[in-house]
Design a protein with these regions (language model features):
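Alpha-helical segment of the N-proximal tetratricopeptide repeat
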Residues: 6-65
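Structural signature of tandem alpha-helical TPR/SEL1-like repeats
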Residues: 21-31, 57-69, 90-103, 125-137, ...
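Structural marker of alpha-solenoid helical repeat scaffolds
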Residues: 36-40, 73, 107, 141, ...
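Conserved alpha-helical positions within TPR/SEL1-like repeat arrays
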Residues: 45-56, 79-90, 113-124, 147-155, ...
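Short coil/turn linkers that connect adjacent helices within long alpha-helical scaffolds
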Residues: 71, 105, 139, 178-181
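TPR/TPR-like (Sel1-like) alpha-helical repeat modules
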Residues: 150, 154-180, 193
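Alpha-helical linker/edge segments of TPR/alpha-solenoid repeat scaffolds
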Residues: 164-167, 190-205
C-alpha cells in the first residue's frame, strides 16, 4: 500500500464507505483521492484510484487496466493485487483470481483486506475451512473488523458450527458503530434468532 499517510487514510476511508456506506459516498471519496494523487504527481496512487472509480461504475475490465498500471509503478501494493482479483471475480474469472490474492499477501503480508477477500471467495465456492483460516488471519491483523466476523459467522454456519456462528454474529453487533448499518443489524438479528432456534431445538428435541 502507499507509503504516503494521506493516501493510506483515503484508502481506508474509501474501503469503509464501500463496506458500510453507499456507492455514492464511495465514489465521492475516490474522486477526491484521485484529485489529491494528481496534485501530488503520485502516479501509482492516481492509477489505483482511477481503478476504484471504474470498479464503482461496474467497468471491471477498465479497472483491471488501471490496477495493472498501479502494480507496475508500485509492485508492493497489496491493495492493487487484491482489487484486481475482485474485478476478475466480477468478470467470472474466478480460479485465476487466487494468484492475485496470493501475490497481494506476498508483497504486503500485513494488509488485512486481502486475507478477508480471499476468505470471502473461498467461502462462496464451498471451501469453508480454508475461508475460516483466512478470516482468522484477518482478525489477527484487525481484531475489530465487523465485516470479517460476519463472513466468519457465515462460514461457521455452513459447517454447522452454530455455536461458533452465533458468537461471531453477536460480535458483529458489538463492533458496528451505533446509528449506522441498520439493515445489516436487522439481517444479523434475524440470523441470530434462527441460530438460537436451531440450538434450542437440538437441546429440546
Amino acid at each position: 500500500m502507499s507509503g504516503h499517510c494521506v493516501f493510506l487514510d483515503l484508502r481506508t476511508e474509501l474501503d469503509n464507505a464501500i463496506t458500510y456506506g453507499t456507492k455514492a459516498a464511495a465514489a465521492k471519496i475516490a474522486r477526491k483521492a484521485l484529485e489529491k494523487a494528481q496534485a501530488a504527481s503520485a502516479g501509482a496512487e492516481e492509477e489505483y484510484f482511477r481503478g476504484q472509480i471504474e470498479m464503482l461504475r461496474g467497468n471491471h475490465s477498465a479497472a483491471i487496466k488501471h490496477f495493472d498500471a498501479a502494480i507496475k509503478l508500485n509492485p508492493a501494493d497489496g491493495a492493487a493485487f487484491n482489487d484486481r482479483a475482485l474485478c476478475m471475480i466480477e468478470l467470472g474469472i474466478i480460479d485465476k483470481a487466487f494468484p492475485y490474492f496470493d501475490k497481494g499477501i506476498e508483497v504486503e503480508p500485513d494488509y488485512a483486506n486481502v486475507y478477508h477477500n480471499k476468505g470471502w471467495l473461498l467461502n462462496n465456492i464451498g471451501r469453508h475451512r480454508e475461508a475460516i483460516a483466512c478470516f482468522k488471519k484477518t482478525l489477527e491483523l484487525e481484531p475489530e473488523r465487523p465485516v470479517t466476523y460476519d463472513n466468519l459467522a457465515d462460514a461457521l454456519y455452513n459447517l454447522q458450527d452454530y455455536g461458533g456462528a452465533l458468537k461471531a454474529y453477536k460480535k458483529v453487533l458489538e463492533l458496528l458503530k451505533p446509528g449506522i448499518c441498520r439493515q445489516i443489524r436487522k439481517q444479523i438479528g434475524i440470523k441470530i434468532k434462527q441460530i438460537e432456534k436451531k440450538l434450542n431445538s437440538a437441546l429440546n428435541p
